């Protein structure tokens, strides 16, 4: 009888251990969570477009206040914005892991989709030559090539490359609005410059000079002459300003460009670092972000600047890999964990967290929403990079609200540089 008691006791002690062990085996890593969401977002777009079927099969949603522009802008917005966020991940080499197989499939689809996008004979030839909106999403396509030049631009056949250069060049017909749109012209021309095609240096330098004039301090730029408190510093301004500067200054090797006084590549990164600190502090202990400003339906696109800093190994000393990854993961899980942000055909649905078409702006369609992919830039880091392998840590607001010690915040001014650039 005594022996039976010991056996029962041993079984009781072993059950929780086995349960915990099984749970650990089934729990997904942060990277696996990111990969699964990115694949779910990208696969319906690229699997269809690679076959010339995106226009046929995409379940399109337009804002209730749609302004009447050609709804075919939807497909270019969808493809361009998706690729700007997806490009770094597709730059990694092939391997036989589940992630590697996902990535290889997406890259194969993407290369076919790039070709269809500029092939007039393809049903998925995009709306290049009508709406001014085309400039915006051509810039995101150009950005995808800048971010993954060797993996996504170089493999394209010569005819496809010539078609892109022709379409990008033709966009000089668009007079960009006096706002972040200047960066769309600068990004397209910067790509042409990198690709060795004729580029308009004035469109680059004048745009960057104006963005520099609109810097208001402490990591914030004004989106045009009047400041607006929204996420456009992350959606567009910091990333595209840095990436255009990177091309024209050769990553800071040319410190002074004659007609661009004040435009400094390294200083632009330092400002982005300050803005990244602000973004990290905006993430609540529960993994939510403040809902303010226009285009809030772009969801996790609001984190692009933080994602860019992580991907390029530019995180400031205030932010560790573990805390940034943990904070971004909890936001991604909260936003995409239950599938509510996808419609019945698998495409993103109008809303912030679920189907909420009433909050979309007059220019918004569900292709616009693929800005959400821009948070996933760190997937361009290998799985063994410290961003992915460092232990998870509590992020700033989580520490603060749980009564832990946390760092004080300080405004950033050029004369008080405290953070380094690798």
Name these PLM-found stretches:
Residues 1-25:
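Bacterial Sec-dependent N-terminal signal peptides
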Residues 23-78, 84, 88, 108-113:
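Low-complexity, Ser/Thr/Pro/Gly-enriched N-terminal "stalk/linker" regions
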Residues 47-70, 123, 331-422:
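CBM-like carbohydrate-recognition segments
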Residues 75, 86-89, 103-255, 261-269, ...:
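Aromatic-lined, polymer-binding surfaces characteristic
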Residues 84, 91-93, 420-421:
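Beta-sandwich/jelly-roll carbohydrate-recognition scaffolds of carbohydrate-active enzymes
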Residues 98-99:
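Long, charge-dense tracts
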Residues 263, 267-361, 387-403:
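Non-catalytic carbohydrate-binding regions of carbohydrate-active enzymes
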